[in-house]
Amino acid sequence: MLPYPQIDPVAVAIGPLQIHWYGLMYLVGIGGAWLLASRRLNKFDPTWTKEKLSDLIFWLAMGVIVGGRLGYVLFYDLSAYIANPLLIFEVWKGGMAFHGGFVGVMIAAWWFGKRNGKSFFQLMDFVAPLVPIGLGAGRIGNFINAELWGKPTDVPWAMVFPPFSDPAQLARHPSQLYQFALEGVALFIILNLYARKPRPTMAVSGMFALFYGIFRFVVEFVRVPDAQLGYLAWGWVTMGQILSLPMIIAGLFLIWLAYKRDPAASKAAA
């Protein structure tokens, strides 16, 4: 068993002002996305300025934050927010959902592309390889917060999370680190290697949806579901799996459609 590193969730405290590691992870994700995007900008569109890129990243970040919060409200704890709608604004207490953030990013990309002469999938193909930076950083934030841990296990790398998080004090899968490794590191490598060569429009977006969906679906088997939801079917299906399955199907369809529309790219890939 590995010891859980005791890290104060509050990174900096200045009087009543507290800056949490989880919030800083959002800044890491946004900043990392901007740096990588700026390196790829000339290949994407030589006419785009760094200012336009900054505008894009800003609106995508808004999509992540607003969509992530609304997604959590709708998918994971709707009854609590109906009973007390003001809870929606208490973001410092946690409650963000990737799938909601993903929808927010898609809406922001569609809106920004329409205003700047880019199609939805042109922008999504450009953005997709940037997303794992934020995903990985977010999972590290979850780990520091000692939240979203996994099921009890006797694997050698199991961890016992702090009593405030897990009163049962059981050795558990550090599922946040699994998601960091898969959704952050592995997905980053896959997408950025794949996007190095010219690909037909929609293909990179399809690869993102496919592999994120697979990685999330698999990790859900060892991650404890949200207490207010539990398992939704057959004693093992979680909300995360239900929301990830359409991503897998959509990813496969987008990849197939992308190469069907561009036979030359299909032959080159073969």
UniProtKB/Swiss-Prot annotation:
One of its GO terms (biological process) is lipoprotein biosynthetic process. InterPro entries: Lgt. The keyword Cell inner membrane applies. The chain crosses the membrane at residues 10-30, 56-76, 92-112, 120-140, 175-195, 202-222, 237-257. GO terms for molecular function: phosphatidylglycerol-prolipoprotein diacylglyceryl transferase activity. A 1,2-diacyl-sn-glycero-3-phospho-(1'-sn-glycerol) binds at R139. Keywords: Cell inner membrane, Cell membrane, Membrane, Transferase, Transmembrane, Transmembrane helix. Pathway: Protein modification; lipoprotein biosynthesis (diacylglyceryl transfer). It is a multi-pass membrane protein. Pfam families: LGT. Its EC number is 2.5.1.145. Its main location: membrane. It is an enzyme of class 2 (transferase). It is found in: Cell inner membrane. One of its GO terms (cellular component) is plasma membrane. Catalyzes the transfer of the diacylglyceryl group from phosphatidylglycerol to the sulfhydryl group of the N-terminal cysteine of a prolipoprotein, the first step in the formation of mature lipoproteins. PANTHER family: PHOSPHATIDYLGLYCEROL--PROLIPOPROTEIN DIACYLGLYCERYL TRANSFERASE, PROLIPOPROTEIN DIACYLGLYCERYL TRANSFERASE. Belongs to the Lgt family. NCBIfam families: lgt. This is Phosphatidylglycerol--prolipoprotein diacylglyceryl transferase. It comes from Pseudomonas savastanoi pv. phaseolicola (strain 1448A / Race 6) (Pseudomonas syringae pv. phaseolicola (strain 1448A / Race 6)). The gene is lgt.
